[in-house]
Amino acid sequence: MTSGEQAKTPLQAPILLTNVKPVGFGKGASQSSTDILIGGDGKIAAVGSALQAPADTQRIDAKGAFISPGWVDLHVHIWHGGTDISIRPSECGAERGVTTLVDAGSAGEANFHGFREYIIEPSRERIKAFLNLGSIGLVACNRVPELRDIKDIDLDRILECYAENSEHIVGLKVRASHVITGSWGVTPVKLGKKIAKILKVPMMVHVGEPPALYDEVLEILGPGDVVTHCFNGKSGSSIMEDEDLFNLAERCAGEGIRLDIGHGGASFSFKVAEAAIARGLLPFSISTDLHGHSMNFPVWDLATTMSKLLSVDMPFENVVEAVTRNPASVIRLDMENRLDVGQRADFTVFDLVDADLEATDSNGDVSRLKRLFEPRYAVIGAEAIAASRYIPRARKLVRHSHGYSWR
């Protein structure tokens, strides 16, 4: 049984969702307000207006809220207990409107078995993972770098780990910045790409403080690969401070390299995102890079991250696509015919509301969000989980290996 998918269990009560407005289901799908009946087996039983339902049905009046395919967060860290930065899936999953979580390299080949047993298998959300190229993954993130030299990579064990976990592992993850690789530069990206080719899976590369250069990374990647932190504002790694880099990123995106937001504590800039989008360069996917050092400040959750992109003029429909169909394609998750009778229910019910919320990017720049994505329910099979945005707690000054920071 894969995570987020039920084995043979007793039937639950049916669910009737009324007055929902479909969005993000692809060309040709109806966008008219409708009702959806989900059977006790978790599969869609009927779609239409004024549906009849059994007496024991759980009835949810969405009051005109949107319904989309279940949201996918392509970049989180949820190996809780196995790394020093990971959070629990429950902190960023269904209760935040997200039905599929993709862990971005928290586990390496040496500890993926624990991640599978203690996190993936018990989770009600669907969980997939990019396997870290470094054997230890993010056990002590940035304190014990996972890619210092070639001794940190074991090709044979990576191949073996993938063979044993191919239903869970969707690609390889490489963090390519000097905090991790030091003077090793772009070499880990080259090694990772070679292994990804052998496994026939995509690679996700974290770009940040050079070396490696963002430019070098893009030149190595190919169609289907992912560059995360695409709109970071770091010196030497911002696509808006170097016209050649912007043009390269634009060309690579056109060729099928996936630009992923990966907000995180240090990797999203309002200014960079606004300038890039104004020039027509949109991110392929919107993800959070949620972990213990970024959740309370500045990220919060996927809905708020989506709202940030909306605030810098990314169109509503593109924002929805960037958390549904687009990231789903990276992990080979079929998004076709999601509203057809007989399909397993996997939805997010949400509103888009007027607001006046102060939000911060990773550089400390502030923007006021005038429109907010507000998740209401995550529907996973025959379970409708009430959802809401994360409400941050009061921040505190925390000492860590590099000094102090607000969290």
Curated annotation (Swiss-Prot):
Q: Specify the species.
A: Agrobacterium fabrum (strain C58 / ATCC 33970) (Agrobacterium tumefaciens (strain C58))
List keywords of the entry alphabetically.
Hydrolase, Metal-binding, Zinc
Q: How does it assemble?
A: Homohexamer, dimer of trimers.
Cofactor mode of binding and number, as noted = Binds 2 Zn(2+) ions per subunit.
InterPro entries assigned to the protein according to its UniProt record, in alphabetical order: Amidohydro-rel (IPR006680), Deacetylase_Atu3266-like (IPR020043), Metal-dep_hydrolase_composite (IPR011059), Metal_Hydrolase (IPR032466)
> Looking at the keywords, is Protein transport present?
no
Q: Which domain of life is it from?
A: Bacteria
Sequence positions that bind Zn(2+) 1: 75, 77, 173, 289
Q: Which CDD domains match?
A: Met_dep_hydrolase_B
Family assignment from sequence similarity = Belongs to the metallo-dependent hydrolases superfamily. Atu3266/EF_0837 deacetylase family.
Coiled coil (residue ranges): none
- PANTHER family the UniProt entry points to: DIHYDROOROTASE-RELATED (PTHR42717), IMIDAZOLONEPROPIONASE AND RELATED AMIDOHYDROLASES (PTHR42717:SF1)
Residues that bind Zn(2+) 2? 173, 206, 229
EC number(s) stated in the UniProt entry for this protein: 3.1.1.-
Q: List, alphabetically, the Pfam families matched.
A: Amidohydro_1
What is this enzyme's class at the first EC digit?
Answer: hydrolase
Positions carrying N6-carboxylysine: 173
Needed cofactors: Zn(2+)
Name of this protein: Deacetylase Atu3266
Q: Residue numbers for the site described as Transition state stabilizer?
A: 175
In UniProt terms, what function does this protein have? Esterase that catalyzes the deacetylation of acetyl-(R)-mandelate (in vitro). Can also hydrolyze acetyl glycolate, but with lower efficiency. Has very low N-acetyl-D-amino acid deacetylase activity with N-acetyl-D-serine and N-acetyl-D-threonine (in vitro). Theoretical substrate docking studies suggest that other N-acetylated amino acids may optimally occupy the active site and may in fact be the physiological substrates.
Q: What is the lineage of its organism?
A: Bacteria, Pseudomonadati, Pseudomonadota, Alphaproteobacteria, Hyphomicrobiales
